[in-house]
Design a protein with these regions (language model features):
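A solvent-exposed interaction/effector surface
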Residues: 2-222
């Protein structure tokens, strides 16, 4: 699939479910509770959820483009049930190994230039391991993410690696100040929640880093 066609598919899909801020808010996302919040920083406790993910060996941006085409075909009926699966957020992407990772329901997640990237869509909660349609493309797999604590840094702006890395540094600085430790082997994830035609200054982007700190004294997410 050409890069032009992938961009058209991405725009058409996201436009159909995120045509307005109200629609974007209605997109299903993984369940979580907020443990701590301070400006752009949050510590969240996520419930278990399923991902449809694929790996691409390429640069930061191209990996996301290639992976999106595979995952889009999966939720469009390229699965054993031949059924369409609802769009979720975010789309997650992260670099495999090297202490960095990524995951899609309402953001798109992604991590560092050059290497193997994992890009994923979040599977709607109505499915479990036994009922989720299985991919027919062997490059796409279903993976269960266990309950875990995630440190989050929210930001707006363009989906460049430079922008992502700048805010990753801010998040890691916050973790050091709080005495929180990243999970061994986990990469920083970029989570993207908005359509590409959303003005860059209005986009919701997040850096996600799994941490070992137990999530206590949680309150429900808004």
């Amino acid at each position: 699939m050409s890069s032009v066609r992938r961009r058209v598919l991405l725009a058409a899909l996201v436009a159909s479910v995120m045509a307005s801020p109200e629609a974007a808010m209605a997109i299903e996302q993984p369940e979580y509770t907020v443990v701590r919040q301070d400006g752009a920083f949050e510590l969240r406790r996520y419930a278990p959820y399923l991902l449809a993910e694929t790996e691409v060996e390429s640069g930061f941006m191209e990996a996301g483009n290639v992976a999106f085409g595979r995952l889009f075909r999966y939720i469009s009926g390229d699965n054993t049930a031949r059924t369409e699966i609802a769009m979720t957020a975010p789309v997650e992407q992260a670099k495999r190994g090297g202490g960095e990772k990524i995951a899609m329901t309402a953001p798109v997640e992604q991590a560092r230039e050059g290497g193997v990237y994992r890009v994923a869509f979040v599977v709607p909660r109505k499915y479990d391991r036994d009922t989720v349609p299985q991919p027919t493309d062997p490059r796409v797999r279903i993976r269960e993410v266990p309950a875990r604590s995630i440190a989050v840094w929210r930001y707006s702006g363009r989906w460049t690696e430079e922008n992502f890395r700048e805010h990753e540094r801010e998040l890691r600085g916050k973790l050091a100040a709080l005495g929180l430790k990243a999970e061994p082997g986990d990469s920083a994830i970029i989570a993207r929640y908005d359509a590409p035609f959303m003005p860059w200054f209005m986009r919701r982007n997040e850096v996600l880093i799994p941490v070992t700190e137990p999530a206590a004294s949680a309150r429900p997410a808004p």
